[in-house]
Design a protein with these regions (language model features):
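Glycine-rich, proline-tolerant flexible connector loops at the mouths of alpha/beta enzymes
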Residues: 11-19, 74-75
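Alpha/beta catalytic cores of nucleotide-metabolism and tRNA/nucleoside-modifying enzymes
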Residues: 21-44, 48-172
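Non-cysteine beta-strand/loop elements that form the S-adenosyl-L-methionine
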Residues: 1-10, 67-68
Length: 172
């Protein structure tokens, strides 16, 4: 194979891990795949919600990332306010492409659009560039060699996001 798509059940509308009892956290899957054969390109799929997730996936060994829900829900040229979003293993998707449904491993829903493609892509680009700079990396190879990993607790995750508004303020 020229490339391997890593991660089962990590997508925002996927229930494969719950239905089948199979799958690992996305970052662990990327680590495992990247260690096996570096002649094969690694595609990270599922669980990418922020530019920071992209940087972590690339640092773990991914050569590419898929950004399903992150990019899927951007402004439509049709001017609609909601868009159908569904997993490829959802009942609706199975009926469309197989004309029958086995046990669904995903859901379908209508989700509000998030904004313009240009704004989101500029934000992602800025976050990725910043992530590389914090690592001291000028390219993907340097990122993967210079990265230092540590475990983060749930308290550390809460501290990492904005949190003043939940205590005593209203976000502007």
């Amino acid at each position: 194979a020229d490339a391997v798509r890593c991660n089962i059940g990590g997508g925002s509308i996927c229930s494969t891990r719950l239905v089948t009892g199979h799958g690992l956290p996305g970052l662990q899957t990327i680590f495992d795949c990247a260690r096996t054969d570096r002649d094969v390109k690694i595609i990270a799929d599922g669980g990418i919600k922020t530019s920071g997730d992209i940087v972590k996936a690339l640092a773990a060994g991914a050569d590419f990332v898929m950004c399903g829900s992150l990019l899927e829900l951007l402004t439509s040229a049709r001017g609609e306010k909601f868009k159908e979003y569904r997993g490829m293993a959802s009942k609706d998707a199975q009926m469309e492409w197989r004309h029958k449904s086995s046990t669904p491993e995903g859901v379908a829903s209508y989700i509000p659009y998030k904004g313009s493609v240009l704004d989101i892509l500029q934000d992602l680009e800025g976050g990725i560039k910043s992530g590389f700079s914090y690592t001291g990396a000028r390219n993907l190879t340097e990122l993967q060699h210079k990265v230092e990993w540590s475990r983060q607790t749930p308290a550390g995750t809460r501290e990492s996001s904005t949190h003043i508004f939940s205590q005593n303020g209203v976000q502007k």
